[in-house]
Amino acid sequence: MRALLRDAQDQTRIALEVEEAVYDPKDNKLFLYTTSETCYAVSKVVRTNADSIIEELVMKGYSDLTQFESEQDE
């Protein structure tokens, strides 16, 4: 499973491949473990859609979608 996280302190985006996800109901946190045995504690899950993520990446200059040709179907 892949996850896109945002660092709580500096808002840096972190993309990672999750090896294991464990939910702790006592602390109300989700712990994501990677293949390099790094653990990320997730305290809030926000449901997003691909359009908003793509728009944000383009606006910040991380992605250039002008390289792809497109045409409208009739």
Label every model-predicted segment:
Residues 2-8:
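A short beta-strand micro-motif
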Residues 8-10, 35:
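Short strand-coil-strand connectors
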Residues 15, 20-56, 60:
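Acidic, low-complexity, intrinsically disordered interaction modules
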Residues 69-74:
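Short acidic DE-rich linear segments
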